[in-house]
A protein has these predicted regions:
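Short, flexible helix-loop junctions that flank or precede catalytic/ligand sites
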Residues: 1-138
Length: 138
């Protein structure tokens, strides 16, 4: 029902209050889906933390590490048939990713993303190469 949702869909996470509400909802067992305008999955994680002042960043990283399941970023590119198709970057919150978020070592996440195919991860470049191999894009 509207009063007791299992899934909460938020628009863009623009400010600290909205991000805080999303994290609280996730911590209380809700599946929270939200949008954020960034260049990729790792940048989305950075942005969520960077919105907060320095004295709150550690707490936010801990909350995020405790509730994040995945970040999916998308780009639309021109297809061979003159339509547009999506390229996707997928960051799964594995124990390694969660630990790096908690420790504030975001700069190390791209290496895990690059090599995380077995966990279901994919970079934009890997997505692009797959679409090229399919002949969907040039």
């Amino acid at each position: 029902s509207r009063e007791d949702p299992d899934v909460i869909m938020l628009g863009e996470l623009r400010d600290s209050d909205t991000i805080r509400q999303a994290l609280t909802a996730a911590e209380t067992g809700h599946l929270v889906l939200a949008t954020l305008h960034t260049r990729g999955a790792v940048q989305a994680v950075d942005r969520l933390v960077d919105v907060f002042p320095a004295d709150e960043k550690a707490l936010i990283r801990t909350q995020l590490a405790g509730s994040l399941k995945a970040v999916i970023a998308q780009q639309l590119v021109s297809a061979t048939d003159e339509t547009r198709v999506g390229l996707f970057e997928v960051l799964i919150a594995t124990s390694a990713v969660v630990n790096l978020i908690r420790e504030g070592k975001m700069h190390q996440i791209p290496a895990i993303l690059q090599t995380g195919a077995q966990a279901g991860m994919q970079t934009f470049e890997q997505s692009r190469l797959a679409r090229q191999a399919e002949g969907v894009i040039h």
